[in-house]
Amino acid sequence: YYDLNRSPIKEDTMAAIERHRWPDPYDSGRYRGLRERARELHKETDFAVVLQVNCAFFLRCAELRGWENFYMDLAGNPKFACALMDRYLDIRLRIAEKALEEVGDNIDIVMVSSDDLGMNDRTILSPKMYSELIKPRQKRTFDFFKDRTPAKRFYHCDGAIYPIIEDLIE
């Protein structure tokens, strides 16, 4: 557990998204040893092998902008919020694609996301806002993995999400 100290994207502009120093999804150091370790665990143990590529775009974008700013973006500047989520997700999916190439069929489960969409008593966003802004990106994410690996997909979400559970199952 950690507390967010500073959010790096201060402005709600496309230029701010472009200026941000995004990670290089093709940095070979990110994947060093992944193929060998996955193969070893798959062949030499009885454990389920889980690839953790967490594409939690909702929470990460809230951290990039600051929680309050991001929620304001979703409500008042959805074009910017969607551009930020799309940029983040593009990078995470490139990382996932490269990781999947490395591990091949040596995984049993892929950790798709851990976006917390609920609070103690309700969803963070209205079901309408979820459906319009978040669900299409989740669908893109889930379809990405469904199309690339037979591994089971693992999705984690905290909170009271009953109003959107059918959307998540879909």
Protein language model regions, located:
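Active-site loop segments of alpha/beta catalytic cores
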Residues: 15-170
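Active-site phosphate/oxyanion-binding loops
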Residues: 8-14
